[in-house]
């Protein structure tokens, strides 16, 4: 039995300089697991609640000492002595202890830190790498990365309304070569921007944040960077967008302030369809407001067979909402953010539900990250096939890519890189 003998919660800082929760779990054998939780900037209204202190004079109200106290008192008391290898039972214990639908009492940040740290300790005790502990012998597929090389929206201080412009390397034989491709395009883009006298400062997720005149201009410039780096747009490298449309939906209209447009759901569907026709876009995330299900249905019917349509704010890693979306034919993919739901067991259930329905699952970071690389192990362990973890700068992003390199090396000859086949939801 891998009995839990000590639990320590603490307040640390994330990549934006805001407090977040870290947890250490010590087992009877002496093995230890440590996990830190991320935090989002653009968040879905139905996400599990991240508990903040609200004390204005300390970290502008964003302290997490209450969440840490929950770990060090009642959570510790509830799970002390439990078997760390019984993840589902441990997470069930946390859920029952919290007793709310949205984890608002204990805080999803407190619960997730414990859930992750326990899994890491159990993997260490079993002598297994974390991805193997999660996925068993079937874990051998590396994910295709969606690399956010231009930031807009809530992730940057510029005129772009769309939040993320991503490159997706798909023709490479290995993850290592895909990562190299992404890095080379990133540096080619930096040179293009510099030559134009545009800003090469980066946003929260490590992508550049220049003031392009339009989304079209941004996408055209990325195509130039792909070619400049020696790759073929549409063959070697595809494009992906995260609209984060909930952020610019006001008074029933999609208000693209940077372009002076106010569009209905049907008009915004036309707008996105035009971009998808003009550029090699393989994936669009949050293309409609999270509550605009009629708009989502329009978008899915229009583009769902040729473009991956990812629900982030739409589904918030929640199986109940995902099930309803599947039944109504909304979207064809789910973004998986571990802190949206708050336990590993619930996270894994969402991934499995998506796969059973023919939806893809994209494992994702948050804009406020730490050096914790657990999501890399989740992506491989559950054979998710896709990961979204930022640009090719900032160590809080690179830590996940570097972990994937280590996993690929550990797998050796049995490692596979799916490329375009990762988008099995497109027919």
Swiss-Prot record:
SUPFAM superfamilies: Enolase C-terminal domain-like, Enolase N-terminal domain-like. It holds the Pfam family Enolase_C. Mg(2+) binds at residues 242, 285, 312. GO terms for cellular component: cell surface; extracellular region; phosphopyruvate hydratase complex. The keyword Cell division does not apply. (2R)-2-phosphoglycerate binds at residues 163, 337, 366-367, 388. Keywords: Cytoplasm, Glycolysis, Lyase, Magnesium, Metal-binding, Secreted. It catalyses: (2R)-2-phosphoglycerate = phosphoenolpyruvate + H2O. GO terms for biological process: glycolytic process. Its cofactor is Mg(2+). Its main location: cytoplasm. GO terms for molecular function: magnesium ion binding; phosphopyruvate hydratase activity. HAMAP family: Enolase (MF_00318). Belongs to the enolase family. This is Enolase. It comes from Burkholderia cenocepacia (strain HI2424). The lineage of its organism: Bacteria, Pseudomonadati, Pseudomonadota, Betaproteobacteria, Burkholderiales.
